[in-house]
Design a protein with these regions (language model features):
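HIT superfamily nucleotide-processing domains
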Residues: 1-134
Length: 134
C-alpha cells in the first residue's frame, strides 16, 4: 500500500506544495512545529534514508539546502532545524523517508504550532515560494 506521501506525490491527496523537482517534492507539514515547517521528500518511496540510491540522496540534500534558504528568507531568520526520524524507534510515523525543515526565527523555542487556520497554508506556501531562488 502506498504511503500517504506517495499518494500526495501521485496527486491523490492535496498539499501546499512549496517546490518540486524530478526526484523530490516539498510541501508544508499539516501539523507544524512552527509556521513554515516544510517537508522535503524523495519521490521514490523508501522507508529509510540509507535505502535511497546515492545520487538521489545527493539530490535530496541539494533540494533541502535550496528550500531551507527560502524558508529562512521568508521568515527573516537564519536558523532552522533539519530533522529526520529514521525508523519507528526514532519517531518516524510515515514509512517514507522525509526531512523536516523547521524555521527558528529569533531563537523561537515554542511547542508544536498545531494546525493552520483555514487559508493560512496557502499564504505561508506563497511566502516561501516567493523566496525560492531569490
Amino acid at each position: 500500500m502506498a504511503s500517504i506521501f506517495s499518494r500526495i506525490i501521485q496527486g491523490e491527496l492535496p498539499c501546499e506544495k512549496i517546490d518540486e523537482t524530478d526526484n523530490e517534492i516539498c510541501f508544508l507539514d499539516i501539523s507544524p512545529f512552527t509556521e513554515g515547517h516544510t517537508l522535503v521528500i524523495p519521490k521514490r518511496e523508501v522507508a529509510r534514508f540509507e535505502e535511497l540510491p546515492k545520487t538521489e540522496a545527493f539530490s535530496l540534500m541539494q533540494t533541502m539546502q535550496r528550500v531551507a534558504k527560502a524558508v529562512c528568507k521568508a521568515y527573516g531568520g537564519s536558523d532552522y532545524n533539519i530533522q529526520l526520524n529514521n525508523g519507528p524507534d526514532a519517531g518516524q510515523e510515515v514509512p517514507h523517508v522525509h526531512f523536516h525543515i523547521i524555521p527558528r526565527p529569533d531563537g523561537l523555542r515554542v511547542p508544536k504550532l498545531g494546525t493552520y487556520a483555514d487559508g493560512q497554508m496557502a499564504d505561508v506556501g506563497a511566502r516561501i515560494r516567493a523566496c525560492l531562488d531569490s
